[in-house]
Amino acid sequence: MKKVLVGIMVFFTFTITQACAYNLKSFSSDSKILSAMQLLEQNGEYEVFANLKKNAVKVKFYHLSMSNVYAANAYDEFGRRVILINSIYKDAPVEQIACLIAHESCHTARKATLDEETRATSKEASCWAKLKRTGVSYPQTKLTKRLDKIANLHIASVEDGNNYIEDKIANSSFYKSQFNL
């Protein structure tokens, strides 16, 4: 009887795992991006994949002429959504690439709003807080500093109930002009 129950449990576990697994290659062909997506999947970031799948999104590295842009959402010639990760971050740690994907996956509107940007940045920050490995020395790049900063804002927001990420975005001159605040 125990063997039958164990067999049934193994069968259901395998079946559920396969049902939840995403075909990551449907999102990208780049090995670094696929590794980042695998890391997101292994850490239970299923919301990221639900957003990507719902919107049939592709993810790729792309030379973004503005070096201060980490990643962006765009549309291809067929109207399909594409997440463009600035190619200057191609050598960034896979955990950081995963955070950029998580952020951009939250954007669904053609024009971002304060609420959407806050959700996206909060998702990016929570992913970094989860994925950043203790004891690993990450390169002190602009991206690392940004991720550390927003992760600290996210943690502080969770601790005291204030939304420091939204405050930071709302007070940013870049976003003030973008959102007409």
Named regions from a protein language model:
Residues 99-111:
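Active-site recognition of the HExxH zinc-binding catalytic motif
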Residues 14-18:
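N-terminal signal peptide c-region/cleavage motif recognized by signal peptidases
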Residues 5, 156-181:
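Pan-zinc metallopeptidase signature
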